[in-house]
C-alpha cells in the first residue's frame, strides 16, 4: 500500500476522538446563518493551535493555506459550511444543542469538524507533498444569497486560485462507511416563488358580486404545472412545488387576496430563466383574464450544482484507494439545493456524500428534522478521506 496513503489513514484514526469532540462542541453550540461568531472563534482557535494562520472572510468565514513544498505548483481547495438551522432539537444526547431553537440538523458540524481533522492531517505531512491546500470554512449555506456567493465575491477563489475544489455533505440514506459520487449534473437550482393574487372579497353567498382570488389562485397553481410538463425539455429534471396557500377567508367569506408560496428547481440555467418568465406571464395573465391581478415575486436562490466529470472520476478513484471499491457508490440526481453550486460555476469541482446512516443504532432520521443525528464512526475516516482526495488531486 502507498506509504502516504497508509499514513493518512493512521492519522485519521488517531485523531478520531478529537474530531468527535470537536463535532460535539459545534453541535452543542450551533449558530444561524451569518451569525457564526462563536463558531468562527472556535474554528480559528483550533487552527491556530495547529500552528496555522487564518484569514477572516465574509464576516464569519475563514481561509487557511497549508503549503507543502513548492507551494505554487498546484492549489486544491477544500470547503466546509458552518451554519445551523432554526430547529428545536429533540435528541437526548450529552451534546444536545445549548442554543434554544437552533440546531445542527444538516450535518454542518460534521463538515466543519471533518475539515479541521483534514487540516490537522495535512499540516503534519506538509513536507511530503508539493503544492498548496486551501481550506474554506464558509458561513451561511442555509440562507440566501448563500455564504459561498459572498466568499467568491470577496476573493476566496483567488490569490491563490485553486485548480479544483472539493466539498462533502453527510448523507442520511447512505450507510456509514460508504461514500457517494456523481459526475455532471447533481443538484438543482432553487428559486422561491411568492405570489399575491388579488380579487374582490365579499359574502360567500354572492360570488357574482366578488372576484374570487381563491378560484384564480387554484387555476394558476394547476396551470403552472403544465409549464413543467409541456414546455420543459423532458430530458432536463425540474420540479415546481407549492407548499403554502393562504386565503384568510371563512366558510362564508371570500377574501380579498390569496398568497401562494413555492419553489422552482431546475438543472439548466437557460431553462431556469425561461421557466420563471413563463410562470410570471401565465400567473399575471390568468389573474387578469378572471378579473383580478397577481403580483409575482422571485427570490433567486442557488444555481444548479455540476460536478466536473474528469475531476469527479479522479476523486472517485482516489476514494476507492482509501475506502475500498465496495464502499464507493454512484449517486442519483438530487433535486435539493446547495450553495456549493456557486463554486462549481467558477472552478472545477467535486461535491460528494459521506454516509452516516446506521439502522442498528437508530441513526435513520433525515436532515432538517429535530431528531437528526449521525453515526460518529464516519468521523474516523471522513477527515482522512478528504485529505487523501486533496493530495491525490495535487499529484494528478
What are the residue ranges of the model-derived segments?
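Divalent metal-coordination and catalytic microenvironments
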Residues: 26, 47, 78, 108, ...
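Non-cysteine beta-strand/loop elements that form the S-adenosyl-L-methionine
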Residues: 79, 88, 193-195, 351-357
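Histidine/acidic-residue-rich, glycine-tolerant segments that coordinate divalent metal ions
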Residues: 85, 91-103, 110, 116, ...
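Short, small-residue-enriched loops and turns at beta-alpha junctions
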Residues: 29-34, 84-86, 143, 248-251, ...
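Histidine-centered active-site/metal-ligand motif
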Residues: 25-29, 104, 108-111, 169, ...
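Acidic/His- and Gly-rich active-site-bordering loop/insert found
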Residues: 2-104, 113-116, 120-129
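Metal-dependent amide/peptide-bond hydrolase catalytic core
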Residues: 218-396
Amino acid at each position: 500500500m502507498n506509504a502516504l496513503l497508509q499514513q493518512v489513514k493512521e492519522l485519521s484514526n488517531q485523531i478520531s476522538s478529537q474530531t468527535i469532540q470537536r463535532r460535539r462542541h459545534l453541535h452543542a453550540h450551533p449558530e444561524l446563518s451569518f451569525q457564526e461568531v462563536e463558531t468562527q472563534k472556535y474554528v480559528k482557535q483550533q487552527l491556530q493551535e495547529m500552528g496555522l494562520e487564518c484569514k477572516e472572510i465574509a464576516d464569519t468565514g475563514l481561509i487557511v493555506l497549508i503549503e507543502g513544498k513548492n507551494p505554487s505548483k498546484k492549489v486544491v481547495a477544500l470547503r466546509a459550511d458552518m451554519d445551523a438551522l432554526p430547529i428545536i432539537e429533540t435528541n437526548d444526547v450529552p451534546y444536545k444543542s445549548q442554543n434554544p431553537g437552533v440546531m445542527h440538523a444538516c450535518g454542518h458540524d460534521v463538515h466543519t469538524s471533518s475539515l479541521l481533522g483534514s487540516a490537522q492531517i495535512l499540516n503534519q505531512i506538509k513536507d511530503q507533498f508539493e503544492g498548496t491546500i486551501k481550506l474554506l470554512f464558509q458561513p451561511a449555506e442555509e440562507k440566501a444569497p448563500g455564504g459561498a456567493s459572498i466568499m467568491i465575491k470577496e476573493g476566496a477563489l483567488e490569490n491563490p486560485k485553486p485548480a479544483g475544489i472539493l466539498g462533502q455533505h453527510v448523507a442520511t440514506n447512505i450507510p456509514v462507511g460508504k461514500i457517494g459520487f456523481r459526475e455532471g449534473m447533481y443538484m438543482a437550482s432553487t428559486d422561491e416563488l411568492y405570489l399575491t393574487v388579488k380579487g374582490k372579497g365579499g359574502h360567500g353567498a354572492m360570488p357574482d358580486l366578488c372576484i374570487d382570488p381563491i378560484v384564480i389562485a387554484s387555476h394558476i397553481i394547476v396551470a403552472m404545472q403544465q409549464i413543467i410538463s409541456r414546455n420543459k425539455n423532458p430530458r432536463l429534471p425540474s420540479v415546481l412545488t407549492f407548499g403554502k396557500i393562504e386565503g384568510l377567508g371563512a366558510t362564508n367569506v371570500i377574501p380579498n387576496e390569496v398568497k401562494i408560496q413555492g419553489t422552482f428547481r431546475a438543472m439548466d440555467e437557460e431553462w431556469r430563466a425561461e421557466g420563471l418568465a413563463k410562470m410570471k406571464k401565465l400567473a399575471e395573465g390568468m389573474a387578469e383574464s378572471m378579473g383580478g391581478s397577481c403580483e409575482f415575486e422571485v427570490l433567486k436562490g442557488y444555481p444548479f450544482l455540476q460536478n466536473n466529470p474528469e475531476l469527479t472520476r479522479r476523486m472517485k478513484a482516489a476514494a476507492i484507494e482509501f475506502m475500498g471499491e465496495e464502499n464507493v457508490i454512484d449517486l442519483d440526481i438530487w433535486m435539493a439545493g446547495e450553495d456549493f453550486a456557486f463554486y462549481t460555476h467558477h472552478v472545477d469541482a467535486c461535491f460528494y456524500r459521506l454516509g452516516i446512516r446506521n439502522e442498528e443504532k437508530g441513526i435513520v432520521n433525515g436532515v432538517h428534522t429535530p431528531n437528526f443525528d449521525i453515526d460518529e464512526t464516519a468521523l474516523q475516516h471522513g477527515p482522512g478521506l478528504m485529505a487523501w482526495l486533496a493530495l491525490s488531486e495535487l499529484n494528478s
